[in-house]
């Protein structure tokens, strides 16, 4: 299932992400994928039987970048311990790599100040 982050609230203690879909019973896998066609980052979650994808669309990227280093919490109860290191890994791979598509790479580089 694709779970879209549709609201983000920044608080002193973290980045609080909200989705209309429930995240009860899900745990983080600690892996992120790129959806360059739809300009998104997909963070893998596991329910014990299958994977779900927590989707961060382009409109959320600037908030992730501006609040780098804060812990990330989904629907007030799912703390993503490995999110930042996975995002950093993805950003390193995307930077200058036109295999993801020039427009996608350009959008990532601009938003995350990679140029």
Curated annotation (Swiss-Prot):
Belongs to the UPF0738 family. This is UPF0738 protein SH1953. It comes from the Bacteria. It comes from Staphylococcus haemolyticus (strain JCSC1435). Pfam families: UPF0738.
């Amino acid at each position: 299932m694709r779970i879209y982050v549709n609201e983000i609230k920044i608080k002193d203690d973290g980045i609080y992400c909200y989705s209309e879909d429930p995240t009860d019973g899900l745990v983080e896998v600690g892996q992120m994928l790129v959806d360059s066609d739809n300009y998104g980052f997909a963070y893998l979650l596991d329910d014990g039987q299958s994977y779900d994808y927590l989707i961060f669309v382009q409109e959320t990227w600037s908030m992730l970048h501006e609040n780098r280093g804060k812990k990330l919490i989904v629907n007030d109860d799912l703390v993503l311990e490995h999110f930042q290191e996975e995002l950093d890994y993805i950003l390193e791979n995307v930077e200058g790599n036109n295999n993801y598509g020039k427009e996608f790479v350009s959008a990532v580089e601009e938003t995350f100040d990679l140029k």
